[in-house]
Design a protein with these regions (language model features):
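Aromatic-lined carbohydrate-recognition surfaces of secreted/lumenal glycan-active proteins
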Residues: 150-151, 177-218, 266-277, 308-314
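Acidic (Asp/Glu)-rich catalytic clusters
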Residues: 43-44, 71-76, 91-103, 136-143, ...
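Glycoside hydrolase catalytic-domain groove-lining segments
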Residues: 224, 228-284
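Aromatic-rich peripheral "rim/lid" segments of glycoside hydrolase catalytic domains that contact
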Residues: 32-43, 47, 51, 56, ...
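Catalytic domains of carbohydrate-active enzymes, especially glycoside hydrolases
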Residues: 50, 60-106, 309
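Active-site groove signature of glycoside hydrolases
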Residues: 136-170, 198-207
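Short, acidic/polar
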Residues: 60-75, 213-225, 290-300
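Active-site clefts of carbohydrate-active enzymes
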Residues: 111-113, 158-163, 263-294, 311-330
Length: 384
């Protein structure tokens, strides 16, 4: 694997003792961010980049709660990344005990604010996010881990009837801007009050109708909300571009990233892929085709070198007319798909590559190096 200089995001995800830009003021950037404390490094931890998630699974096979059962399965694959819905710090405790290094969390991902973001709702939102963040920052069991707090596909909040020929209304757009900024302030206030924190907590907003804005000029989260908020990162639910040529995929990610105001202490590239993938049904219930097409999608998205690319998902959540749609790595009969095997082998290959790099260079790979390695590895795989 070639030696690529680690960029700032790689440093963030690997938890260095200090951010490269920490303590330095950038006069060209008007936005300010609370200084982040130094945190310890987890032994042998590196940004794995590729991962999966579990939301609303339609089945399970043990006495465990369905999401927890799936999280165990994801960990058994060798994954270091987990994306789930979070309700409270207490609910997260068994997940934090697992050997994941990065947690992408839907937290308070509801549409209550779309009905009018009243002072009382603002107060409740701020308090909940502040207390949740402070809990993560002060717990002993979160040491060395990174948490991203965000929400489900933001454009559906702005288009409640899912009519993509419409623009988002000014009222909903303004409410979303305020909602995201309240959440950001809560996280930054909590971060500033815990100088001894042993983990990282960031915010993200999720966009999902990017091409509407990019190609048709429609008002969407990406162009109407992102330029006016102060979120740390952006998640892109990439279904509207994942089947396009690789040049268009990269251009779309560039477009999303360009809408973000720069932030001191954070890298220039702050977009990750929060959802992608084709269902079993969309691939004709053919395991080999499902593996190949999704492997190609993952490799294509990795060419942009995002910090994460997350496949949707481990257990299927969609059932139509009694039939499983098949957004899965493990089906409703507890059969592991060929794609499950591919990702499990990828995670093992990443571990070996990281060990080799550490032995050779005395450092672990950064996110861009792992993204490049994973892209090449996936492209080199023979069809199953």
């Amino acid at each position: 694997m070639s030696s690529i200089p680690r960029l700032l995001l790689g440093a963030l995800l690997l938890f260095p003792l200090a951010l490269l830009a920490q303590g330095k003021k950038r006069t060209d950037q008007p936005l300010e961010m609370a200084r982040l404390p130094a945190v310890p490094t987890l032994p042998d931890a590196f940004p794995q980049v590729v991962g999966t998630q579990v939301f609303g699974p339609a089945y399970k096979f043990t006495k465990d709660e369905a999401v927890f059962e799936a999280a165990k399965g994801i960990s058994a694959m060798g994954s270091r990344i987990l994306k789930i819905n979070a309700v409270s710090g207490q609910q997260l405790t068994p997940y934090v005990a697992m050997p994941f290094t990065h947690y992408v969390l839907w937290y308070r991902s509801s549409n209550e604010w779309t009905k009018g973001f009243t002072p009382e709702l603002r107060r409740r939102e701020y308090n909940a996010v502040y207390l949740f963040t402070k809990d993560l920052l002060t717990r002993y069991d979160t040491a060395g881990k990174t948490f991203f707090l965000g929400h489900w596909e933001g454009d559906w909040y702005l288009l409640p009837d899912k009519d993509v020929k419409k623009d988002a209304s000014p009222e909903l757009t303004a409410a979303m801007i305020e909602w995201l900024n309240v959440r950001q302030k809560a996280v930054e206030d909590a971060r500033s009050e815990v100088p001894y924190a042993k983990c990282r907590v960031y915010t993200y907003a999720e966009v999902n109708r990017v091409r509407d804005a990019m190609k048709d000029g429609r008002k969407r989260v990406v162009n109407a909300v992102l330029p006016k908020v102060n979120v740390d990162f952006v998640s892109y639910s990439a279904y509207d571009s994942q089947l396009l040529p690789v040049e268009e995929v990269r251009a779309t990610l560039d477009y999303v990233n360009a809408q973000l105001p720069a932030k001191p202490g954070l890298p220039a590239k702050r977009v990750f892929v929060g959802e992608c993938g084709l269902s079993w049904k969309a691939c004709g219930a053919d395991g080999a085709k499902h593996e190949q097409r999704n492997r190609e999608i993952l490799a294509k998205l990795l060419t942009w070198k995002p910090a994460m690319v997350l496949f949707w998902q481990y257990y299927n959540n969609e059932v139509v007319d009694g039939e499983q749609v098949g957004f899965w790595l493990v089906d409703n009969k507890n059969n592991k798909t060929p794609l499950h095997a591919t990702l499990t082998e990828l995670f093992a290959a990443q571990e070996e590559a990281a060990k080799e790099m550490r032995a050779r260079t005395r450092r672990l790979p950064g996110y861009e190096e792992i993204a490049a390695f994973s892209e090449n590895w996936l492209n080199a795989r023979a069809p199953r």
